[in-house]
Amino acid sequence: METSEHIPVLLAEAVAALEIAPNGRYLDATFGRGGHSSEILAQLGESGQLYALDRDQQAAAVAAQITDPRFHFARCAFSEMETAFAALGAESLDGILFDLGVSSPQLDDPSRGFSFAKEGPLDMRMDNEQNLTAQKWLKNVDEDTLTTVIRDYGGEPHTVAKRIAKAILAAKNDLKSTLDLASVVAQARPKKLYKPHLHPATQTFQAIRIAVNDEIGEIQRALRAATMMLKSGGILVVISFHGLEDATVKRFVRSMEGEPLPAEIPATNTTNIHQVLRLVPPVIKPSSAEIAQNPRSRSAKLRKAVKL
């Protein structure tokens, strides 16, 4: 299977957490370049089945090269998994894997507009056919909304987020590329907040990307769908890469366990779902060896839950 240049994070740990049964039915909800799917297929028996999905056009092109009859792919957002796989009989699964966030091929391709370090269009779409780009979003967003997005999705202090938002909107008609945006953010962000080896536009780019792709809403809807599709005893494995993703996963699983939410995790309507998941500790993080090989893995966290 062609996996491109993408290095799957926590590969062995994620597949081990799924506890692959040779004749089981599994879903790789974030196919990417097929790294996790390849390992799952290697562990499945002849009658095992692997379903996979991704909304990225290039990921779909990689999936189209796979001729293994046990493999089934649909191009869609992972929140649409129930509809996509109902016709294939994938409504009762032994395990589902999510590898959240943006992939290395997406980050490294300047034409996708995710990188603050390379010249590219203000795009940031995970689905190339989605109408809304980062440039369109920035042209229409108001200052309060942009401030909230940079604060909540980027983790910037409110006063800093507001300062960055003002600067972006003041320059929005002149923003033609990722480097234009990165420059505006870098100039607006207070120098005292600069961190070694971290570009000053990192958090703002993350925030805008999350907003353009509705990533948090997608995760919430996808976790609901995944819980419905798992059979009793089925395993949910989620790899997250930043605090907001991880908090969203924790909030969902805690609501499904029926436990009180900690103060730092605000309640949402996920608390109305029946308690059907059990969290399986511990949280798994990359080894020092993996981080050395793939520095982008350093913030990854793997959480596992079992459907009761």
UniProtKB/Swiss-Prot annotation:
This is Ribosomal RNA small subunit methyltransferase H. PANTHER family: 12S RRNA N4-METHYLCYTIDINE METHYLTRANSFERASE, S-ADENOSYL-METHYLTRANSFERASE MRAW. One of its GO terms (cellular component) is cytoplasm. The keyword Methyltransferase applies. Its EC number is 2.1.1.199. It catalyses: cytidine(1402) in 16S rRNA + S-adenosyl-L-methionine = N(4)-methylcytidine(1402) in 16S rRNA + S-adenosyl-L-homocysteine + H(+). Signal peptide: none annotated. Belongs to the methyltransferase superfamily. RsmH family. One of its GO terms (biological process) is rRNA base methylation. It is found in: Cytoplasm. It comes from Dichelobacter nodosus (strain VCS1703A). It is an enzyme of class 2 (transferase). S-adenosyl-L-methionine binds at G34, G35, H36, D54, F85, D99, Q106. One of its GO terms (molecular function) is rRNA (cytosine-N4-)-methyltransferase activity. Keywords: Cytoplasm, Methyltransferase, rRNA processing, S-adenosyl-L-methionine, Transferase. Specifically methylates the N4 position of cytidine in position 1402 (C1402) of 16S rRNA.
